[in-house]
Swiss-Prot record:
Belongs to the DapB family. Catalyzes the conversion of 4-hydroxy-tetrahydrodipicolinate (HTPA) to tetrahydrodipicolinate. It catalyses: (S)-2,3,4,5-tetrahydrodipicolinate + NAD(+) + H2O = (2S,4S)-4-hydroxy-2,3,4,5-tetrahydrodipicolinate + NADH + H(+); (S)-2,3,4,5-tetrahydrodipicolinate + NADP(+) + H2O = (2S,4S)-4-hydroxy-2,3,4,5-tetrahydrodipicolinate + NADPH + H(+). (S)-2,3,4,5-tetrahydrodipicolinate binds at H132, G141, T142. The lineage of its organism: Bacteria, Pseudomonadati, Campylobacterota, Epsilonproteobacteria, Campylobacterales. The keyword Iron does not apply. NAD(+) binds at G8, A9, K10, G11, R12, M13, G75, T76, T77, A99, T100, N101, M102. Pathway: Amino-acid biosynthesis; L-lysine biosynthesis via DAP pathway; (S)-tetrahydrodipicolinate from L-aspartate: step 4/4. GO terms for molecular function: 4-hydroxy-tetrahydrodipicolinate reductase; NAD binding; NADP binding; oxidoreductase activity, acting on CH or CH2 groups, NAD or NADP as acceptor. Its main location: cytoplasm. This is 4-hydroxy-tetrahydrodipicolinate reductase.
Length: 242
C-alpha cells in the first residue's frame, strides 16, 4: 500500500481526499498535515505527498522537500512565478506533478480547446469559469491554464491579449483578444467553458464538475502513478499520455 500524506488536510480538498482514500485499495493515509504541524513527520511517514494548501504553504513545502525529497502532487492554485521556479528547481531531485485541476475531463477539455484554437483561427475566443462563493482567487487556475493553451496554439502571448472584464464604451473587440471571465455564487464546484465565435456559427466546449470527489480521485490516481516515476516535472498530459 502506498502511503499518502495530505498537506492542507483541513481544507475542502484535503477533507475530500481523506474521505476518498478510505475506500482506496492501492493507497492509504499516512498523515494529515495542516499549518503548524510537523513537516519532518509528514515526509518520514509518506511515500508521496498531495498538496492542496495555499501559495505560502506550497512555498514552505517545496523548501523543506529539498532536505528530504519525496514525490509531490501539487494542486494549489494562485502560485506566482517565484514558487513555480522553485518547483521546477526542486523537480531536479524528486518527481513533482503540478496541475491547476486534477480532473481528467478538464485535461481533455484543455487538449480539445488547444486543437480548436489552432483549427479555428478566425474565431473569437471567450472563456468563462464559474465557482462557489467561497473561492478566493479569480480567475481560476484552470481558466488561466485554458487561456494559456489557446493563446499558445495561436502563437500569442497571453499577457498581451487577455481581457478580464469589459465596461463602458470600450470600442470593438480586437482580433486576438482572449477574454477570461469569472462568476461566483452558491455551491458551484466548478464549470469551465471555452467558446469559439464566428459570424454565423459558434462552438462552445464545456466541462462541469458536480463533486469535489472528481478532483480528489484524480489526485489519488496521479499520486499512485507519480510514486513510481523518476525526478522531473510532470503535467496532466504526461499522466494521460497525450
Amino acid at each position: 500500500m502506498i502511503k499518502i500524506g495530505i498537506y492542507g488536510a483541513k481544507g475542502r480538498m484535503g477533507k475530500q481526499i481523506e474521505e476518498c482514500l478510505k475506500s482506496e485499495t492501492q493507497a492509504q493515509i499516512s498523515i494529515l498535515y495542516d499549518k503548524g504541524g510537523n513537516l519532518g513527520e509528514l515526509f518520514e511517514k509518506s511515500d508521496v505527498i498531495i498538496d492542496f494548501s495555499s501559495p505560502s504553504g506550497t512555498h514552505e513545502l517545496l523548501n523543506y522537500a529539498r532536505t528530504m525529497p519525496k514525490p509531490l502532487v501539487i494542486g494549489t492554485t494562485g502560485l506566482d512565478e517565484k514558487i513555480l521556479h522553485l518547483m521546477q528547481s526542486a523537480s531536479e531531485v524528486m518527481p513533482i506533478f503540478y496541475a491547476t485541476n486534477m480532473s481528467l475531463g478538464v485535461a481533455v477539455l484543455n487538449y480539445l480547446a488547444s486543437k480548436a484554437s489552432q483549427m479555428l483561427r478566425n474565431f473569437d475566443i471567450e472563456i468563462l469559469e464559474m465557482h462557489h462563493r467561497h473561492k478566493k482567487d479569480a480567475p481560476s487556475g484552470t481558466a488561466m491554464t485554458l487561456a494559456q493553451s489557446v493563446a499558445k496554439a495561436r502563437n500569442l502571448e497571453l499577457e498581451k491579449v487577455r481581457v478580464s472584464g469589459r465596461d463602458g464604451i470600450i470600442g470593438e473587440r480586437s482580433k486576438d483578444e482572449i477574454a477570461v471571465m469569472s462568476l461566483r455564487g452558491g455551491d458551484i464546484v466548478g464549470r469551465h467553458m471555452v467558446g469559439f465565435y464566428e459570424d454565423g456559427e459558434f462552438l462552445e466546449l464545456n466541462h462541469t464538475a458536480t463533486s469535489r470527489a472528481t478532483f480528489a480521485k484524480g489526485a489519488i490516481k496521479i499520486a499512485i502513478w507519480l510514486s513510481k516515476q523518476e525526478a522531473k516535472m510532470y503535467s496532466i498530459n504526461d499522466f494521460l499520455g497525450i
